[in-house]
Amino acid sequence: MTLPEIDSLSITLLMDNYTDRLLPSSLIAIRPPMMKNEQFLPPPPPVAEHGFSALIRVASNDSMAYQNKGESLNENIILFDCGTSENGVVSNAETLGINFNSINSVILSHGHFDHFTGLPSILKRIDKPHQINLPS
């Protein structure tokens, strides 16, 4: 199997069993700020609950797209797992300013409730046609 070369990869954790708003950002982890202009920001803290969900952005330089449309970056956005509650991942995505319509694919790692329960709420927020493929 040959994997294509990519130019950038970012992973935004939407649900991972844990949250700590007091941790500062670092070179490898950019966290939402708690304060702006010495004032606490009003959004609620992220929902912390059992389960997992991550938004994965993969960007690659696509020379064919560059020749045809003048664009040089092809980005795919994947939602990997959907959390354990109806609205936990939705709430965290909204807090982080994530638009569900930007998602190209949803991947469920396995059939445990803490990885798929949020899927119906997420699909309701995607305003474009989508296809669901289930293994036989």
Stretch-by-stretch model annotation:
Residues 9-12, 76-78, 105, 130-131:
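Structural motif
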Residues 15-17, 82-84, 111:
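Active-site metal-binding loops of divalent metal-dependent hydrolases
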Residues 136:
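Metallo-beta-lactamase
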Residues 87-133:
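Active-site metal-binding motif and surrounding structural segment of the metallo-beta-lactamase
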Residues 1-74:
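Zn-dependent metallo-beta-lactamase
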Residues 51, 83, 117-118:
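Glycine-centered flexibility sites
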Residues 45-47, 58-61, 66-105:
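Pre-active-site segment of Zn-dependent metallo-hydrolases
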